Amino acid sequence: MKIIHYIPSIDRTSGGTTAYMQLLANELGKLVELHIVSHVSNNPVNIGNCQVHYIPTFNQYRKMKRQWLFLLNEINPDIVHINCCWMPGCALTQKWSQELNYKIVLTPHGMLEPWIIKRHYWTRKIPALLLYQKNAIIKAITLPTIMKWRNQNEDNRCYSGTL
């Protein structure tokens, strides 16, 4: 099985999602052909048992799309796993992958919690929801959660129309 994980940053200063990816890759990479796609950073973490690929950021939209599509065609993954939300690059990589009929797993890493959604609601969340985020959540084949209360929050927001 081949899996591509997209994560906006694997920099040491990026926090929990980067640490999660590092731990996950060390074990998952023993079982599958694992590729991690991110953007260049000044201080990336070392991630074992996988191939790390760097693509341009959203600021270079055309280059980002071209390199993402190239990687998809070269690797031909069974699953594309998007590890984030609220960022245009995440929604775009998902959209481009789904246009080529790849299966998508979207892991928001707690970013659908009510307190996160309320933070910068009018300036960031509403525009993101209207432009791409709600559609990305609905179109993912799965939205994994690890805690019961988080699962309830995400299910309520995603499927009740309150997102």
Regions found by a protein language model. Name each.
Residues 42, 112, 144-150:
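Alpha-helix capping/helix-boundary segments
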Residues 8, 108-111, 161-163:
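Histidine-centered beta-alpha loop that forms part of the nucleotide-sugar donor binding/catalytic region
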Residues 1-43, 48-51:
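N-terminal subdomain of nucleotide-sugar transferases
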Residues 79-114, 131:
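An aromatic- and histidine-rich active-site surface loop
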Residues 99, 122-140, 152-155:
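Membrane-proximal helix-turn-helix segments that form the acceptor-binding/catalytic region
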Residues 146-163:
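Helix-loop-beta element that forms the nucleotide-linked donor phosphate-binding surface
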Residues 45-71, 75, 79-86, 115-123:
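A short, charged, and often flexible helix/loop element on the N-terminal side
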